[in-house]
């Protein structure tokens, strides 16, 4: 019965153009990767799909640091953090992260997690008890959505970036604990939350602002300190989750917050307590990553990334203006996430396939990840891309647009 049901559902997904496929990368994360899929021969593709925003995932210094960490601490941690798996590498990384966020969160402490998904589940389920209300942007990342649903708190969602709706919800709320929860940079649209106004609402209504800075950490703000720094925010009411497998180039995540919040997570957050700690070697490598992000090389990489973003937006705007019949729309984003919205699932899949045929890897994103009718190519840029890479992408999109238009009846 189960297998019959699942096979029926899988066929339904395939008919709707919603089937997901995994590809196998046979080389390190980089703009050019060797990739295979479903037994097909491997090919070299120009990729615009990773979250390696600063191009650090294969940086020689991080590769060396990871190997050094393995020599120092072995391959694995062997236990959860609260048994025997919490190493000096984890503790040192948490101290570094706390210092990193201290200009924005006074007296901050930090807690390291294996993944961003686990960090968000831990944070919202631990703080979102029956005496709390969670106010969540409707376009928040799936991990924030799931964390809010699993929490015992009352959940209220507000239309994307609608501060007026949020203010009314807060004004009507009488629970003692109020958590405003938002992405800083929204993962599928690339736009940035109005964090200063959200913090003002938190202060006005005695709430706390939980910020998922997965796509801002390392890229935005002074020395890449993230979205809180980008806006010049400083408040004990801020709780920041950041991921360390995107701009930081390695893996894991952290929560930085008031010391009492961090202690509460250690005591009660089930996704932290009941899982084996990440390998200490990863934490060791991440300390080197922070040094790179906050140094001169980090500044240079952020400058390169911003130049590529400006180039791509300018050249895509020209392309869209020249071929209006395609119905493409470039989302309003100033970040490394540049969504090209094409509409239907079929159109997005066809465009991704046309680019693949030209040797470019740009994934089609479809519902339920994005709202129905807004299927898109999620173009992501890295500081490791070149201006020629961006030009090649735009030229390939122009050719694909012509080919697809000519193929229509």
UniProtKB/Swiss-Prot annotation:
Functional pathway: Cofactor biosynthesis; biotin biosynthesis
Residues noted as binding pyridoxal 5'-phosphate in the record, renumbered to the chain: 116-117, 187, 215, 243
Pfam families for this protein: Aminotran_1_2 (PF00155)
Record field: catalytic activity: 6-carboxyhexanoyl-[ACP] + L-alanine + H(+) = (8S)-8-amino-7-oxononanoate + holo-[ACP] + CO2
Record-level GO BP terms: biotin biosynthetic process
The protein's Enzyme Commission number: 2.3.1.47
Keyword DNA repair in annotation: no
Reported cofactor(s): pyridoxal 5'-phosphate
InterPro entries named in the record: Aminotransferase_I/II_large, AON_synthase_class-II, AONS_Archaea/Proteobacteria, AONS_Proteobacteria, PyrdxlP-dep_Trfase, PyrdxlP-dep_Trfase_major, PyrdxlP-dep_Trfase_small
Residues that coordinate or bind substrate: 20, 141, 369
Chain positions found as N6-(pyridoxal phosphate)lysine: 246
Keyword field: Biotin biosynthesis, Pyridoxal phosphate, Transferase
GO molecular function list: 8-amino-7-oxononanoate synthase activity; pyridoxal phosphate binding
Family, per entry: Belongs to the class-II pyridoxal-phosphate-dependent aminotransferase family. BioF subfamily.
Task of the protein: Catalyzes the decarboxylative condensation of pimeloyl-[acyl-carrier protein] and L-alanine to produce 8-amino-7-oxononanoate (AON), [acyl-carrier protein], and carbon dioxide.
NCBIfam families: bioF
Subunit: Homodimer.
Protein name: 8-amino-7-oxononanoate synthase
Gene giving rise to this polypeptide: bioF
